């Protein structure tokens, strides 16, 4: 448990490490005990940032989850969520790289940031307003998902 918590603390402290290892954090977060509670609390984050739920016959996934349960890793979920709240904005895709003016993924990532950390969302939004003010479809998709 100490090594897991140490790794999570490293991710929280260093954004470069977070950017490199966020897919592993996503897998860990979805495998941790009680991670299903995130589905109700942060539905867009759960759908956008975390990997899709595996099938019941996914042996490796079941093995990881049972191992984490045996380790009593449940409290690690709070630390993992602290890391996400701190750094999720770093992996939001840049609208400048959108394909055919489809910004629905960008809007979903923004909504996920909004769910976890409203201050960071406000900062990201102000940056986007300056940089992407002329992308009407971006703002349309943001509005459609409930953001402005």
What are these regions (language model features)?
Residues 1-148:
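Eukaryote-biased, non-catalytic alpha-solenoid scaffold regions
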